[in-house]
Amino acid sequence: MIKLKNISKIFDVAGKKLNALDNVSLDIPKGDICGVIGASGAGKSTLIRCVNLLERPTSGSVFVDGQDLTQLSEAQLIAERRNIGMIFQHFNLLSSRTVYENVALPLTLEHMAKEKIHEKVTALLALVGLTDKKDVYPANLSGGQKQRVAIARALASDPKVLLCDEATSALDPATTQSILKLLKEINRTLGITILLITHEMDVVKNICDQVAVIDKGQLIEQGSVSEIFSNPKTELAQEFIRSTFQANLPEEYLAKLTDTPKRSDSYPIIRFEFTGRSVDAPLLSQTSRKFNVSFNILVSQIDYAGGTKFGFTIAEVEGDEDSITQAKIYLMESNVRVEVLGYVD
C-alpha cells in the first residue's frame, strides 16, 4: 500500500546541505500498522511528510496504492491526497468551530450535500466515541478528546492510508493507551493502512505489525515487531526495547555499585535479556547447576510484542571468577544478552 523507494531529502540550512533522509526504502503492505521509531532529529517527521508530499523528496519515488505521487501534476496530487489522512501531535482544530463542524470541514470543502455530511459525521463521531460532544468547542475538550476529533476529521474522506505524526506524544499514559486502542480498532474495522512515527517503543509494541528504526536519516533496521523484539540487530533497537522495561536497581545496590571489583570477594550485578525460546527455557537454573554459581534475582520482567515473549532479569551472581565467566559464555551461546552493570561487595 505504501512503498518508499530510495527516498532522499536534502535541506539547505544557512547555505549548508543537511541530509534529512538518505536513500530510505520502506514497503508497508495493505492493512498493516507500521511504526517508524527514532530519536529526535532522526528524520521521522520528514519521512512521514514525504508520504503525502508535504515534503517533496529530493530524489526517489513515493507509491501509495500503486500510484507514484512524485509523478503527478498538482491537481492530480490534490485528488490523491484524499486517500491519505493525517493526524499530528498538535491537534490543529479550529477553535471557533464545534466538534461536529471540525469533522465536517473537509466534507464541506468538497461541497458534499448536507444530508450526507450529517450522516457521515454522525457515524465518525460514534466511531471515535464522541457522539455526546458534537456541539462542544475544542477549548472544552481534553487532550485525548481533541485527538479523537482530529482522527474523525482525518477519516472523513474515507482514506486508504492514515499517517500519524507523534499522535500520542502530548498525551498522558492512560489517554495514550485509549488512542492506540482506537487506532487499532480503526485498522481492524476499516482496513486502513497506518504509518505512525514515534520515539516510544511502547507504542510500537502495543499496536504495530512492522517496525523500522531510523537514525541520522537512514533506516538502520526494519522487520516485523516479533522479529525486531526477538532479535534486535542494532544497538539503537536494543536501547529502544530496553526502554520498555522498568529496569531500575534498588537504591541500596545503586549506592554501592562500582565499575570494577574492589575486593576479591566482590561479585557482579548482571543484566540478562531473554527473547524467543530463551524466555521459556530454565536457563538460569541450568546454568547454576552446571557451573556452580548462584543467582540472586533483584529485578525481573516479562512482556509480549507481536506475539513474541521477551524479558530481562537483573541478578547478583556469586561464584568463583572462572565459573562466572563460563556461565556468561554459556548463556550468551543460548541467545541471552549479558551485560555486567557493575560490582558490589
Swiss-Prot record:
Coiled coil: none annotated. GO terms for cellular component: Gram-negative-bacterium-type cell wall; plasma membrane. One of its GO terms (molecular function) is ABC-type D-methionine transporter activity. Keywords: Amino-acid transport, ATP-binding, Cell inner membrane, Cell membrane, Membrane, Nucleotide-binding, Translocase, Transport. SMART domains: AAA, NIL. It is found in: Cell inner membrane. Its EC number is 7.4.2.11. It catalyses: L-methionine(out) + ATP + H2O = L-methionine(in) + ADP + phosphate + H(+); D-methionine(out) + ATP + H2O = D-methionine(in) + ADP + phosphate + H(+). The keyword Cell inner membrane applies. It is an enzyme of class 7 (translocase). It is a peripheral membrane protein. Residues 2-241 form the ABC transporter domain. Gene3D superfamilies: 3.30.70.260, P-loop containing nucleotide triphosphate hydrolases (3.40.50.300). Belongs to the ABC transporter superfamily. Methionine importer (TC 3.A.1.24) family. Part of the ABC transporter complex MetNIQ involved in methionine import. Responsible for energy coupling to the transport system. The complex is composed of two ATP-binding proteins (MetN), two transmembrane proteins (MetI) and a solute-binding protein (MetQ). This is Methionine import ATP-binding protein MetN. It comes from Mannheimia succiniciproducens (strain KCTC 0769BP / MBEL55E). The lineage of its organism: Bacteria, Pseudomonadati, Pseudomonadota, Gammaproteobacteria, Pasteurellales.
